[in-house]
Amino acid sequence: MKILWLSSWFGDYRVPVYDNLNRLSDGAFWIVCSEMETSELVRRKLREKLGDHAIIMPQQKIIRLGNADSDFANSSLALHWQQGLYSAIRNVKPDVIIVEGFGRWAPAGIIYSILHRKRLLMFYERTAWTERKAGWWRTLYRRLAGKAVDCFLSNGAFSEQYLRENLGFSSAPIIRGCMSADSFYLHYDVEAELEARHKADREAECRNGKGIRFLYVGRIVEPKGIRQLLEAWEIHHRSYPDDTLTLAGEGILLNEMRERYGDDKGIIMAGYVSYDRIYSYYKDCDVVVQPTLEDNWSLVIPEAMSCGRAVMCSIYNGGYPELVKDSVNGYSFDPLDKEGFVNAFAKFHSANLLKMGRQGMMIEKNFSPEKAALRIYKACCPVV
């Protein structure tokens, strides 16, 4: 059984899933991706794991319509044309095709599956909240194109709810838990650096006047809730002046936020941090905060959990129902409710951070690359 996954863009976190799918299929897994939309680091890792089964397509043409400057979902329309894509699919002669959502390269996979009567799986991440501005024509297209899909692979409850209630696939097979973070390697890197240091020292630091170390990892842009984060932090810091907040990431708001906040009020603007070094930031924090205003399934939360860190997660992150259990491994909050946001920061001062971290590690294990790959592989198997 040959499995072919079409995905023009993805990050490092996907490579372990692809590697596990390749093992489960006894080497009968292929991935087609874009050279223009993936990093050199990702392409190198793919070649190491998959060899010539990693098909990397050269430059593609992208036409953007609408407000291309906005980072919010559905603010613009991007049309992707990749020369040779259909030929690449045809050369593999797959028994199963996996596409990413309805856009980008998905139409090529959908057409091939219909013409050649092959099993079609669709990896779908969006939620009703992220798609609240999708428009009638996007919704109509998705309802029509989705009729060709044999099984949907979703992040969790919110994605399944959107597929069933908003797009009308009420009886379609939908497999949850198909997203994962690169948890194994992050956990390994953090543990390697902490080996010579007793873990209990972290809690002692929080109780000896050094405060709690909060961390944000991600782009410094409007949809990530950066303005709301720093406004709430200003208020929180007046009551807890020993706490610190580190922002690891870059984006269009970075310079503006640096000018406004600098490094005062316990705020540290770290700027860009490579994926291969992000583990050191997880190692040196106590709580990871994700204040997003819209996100399908933020990978930062399971990454933090795999490293044994408590989490503070926005209710607009599509993954929070599965990943965040209030008072168990962290707290959820509404970033648009400033008072609630500030209160969420304060809750960690009466929490057992080490216990929360351990609970988070247990929850995250259900979303490991191995388990995600196994769920996906089982969805492929009905063709046998």
Regions found by a protein language model. Give the residues of each.
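Short hydrophobic beta-strand element within catalytic cores of glycosyltransferases
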Residues: 310-314
